[in-house]
Amino acid sequence: MLFRSLFPLPIPFPGIKLGLANLVIVLVLYKNGFCQALTVSIVRGLLNAFTFGSLFGFLYSLAGSVLSLIIMNLLKNKTHLHISAFGVSVVGGITHNIGQFAVAAWLVGPSAILPYFPFLYFSGLIAGGLIGAFVLLCRQRIPLFSSTN
């Protein structure tokens, strides 16, 4: 969150972020596996909630993180589909926002936020693509992450 505040983006919709922390999560998922990525994600969410946020912020973060990690892990392990880390990250960005949307729908009702869904979907698509591109660069240029899986 602190790092993200150094790069303010003029995004006109509340709650839409680039999700730079997801770069680390995706790299950990590929390097160390699901359990480690889940641990990092939960610890990040807790630290963020205690430092900058609230219980509701943690619920949004947890729902998005867990759902996206489960789906990304499933796609990563489906080797017969030949989905790259870029594709996995794009789907992760979208499913992260779907998880957060589900929490918001549960809290305020789906009809109140349904018009917001297309913006969340496309922001997840774009953010997931940008993070996916960074993941590919990191896996190519940083020896620690250059494994073939």
Predicted regions and their residues:
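Generic transmembrane alpha-helix motif of multi-pass integral membrane proteins
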Residues: L20-F34, I71-K76
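Helix-adjacent hinge/juxtasegments
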Residues: C35-N77
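Hydrophobic transmembrane-helix microenvironments that flank and shape a buried ionizable site
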Residues: G19, S41, G45, S61, ...
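Hydrophobic transmembrane alpha-helices
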Residues: M1-V28
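Membrane-embedded alpha-helical hairpins and interfacial helices in multi-pass inner-membrane proteins
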Residues: S54, F58-L59, K78-N149
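Aromatic-anchored segments of alpha-helical transmembrane domains
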Residues: M1-R4, V43-G53, G93-G99
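Short, motif-level signal for alpha-helix interfacial/capping segments enriched in acidic residues
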Residues: P10-F13, N73-H80
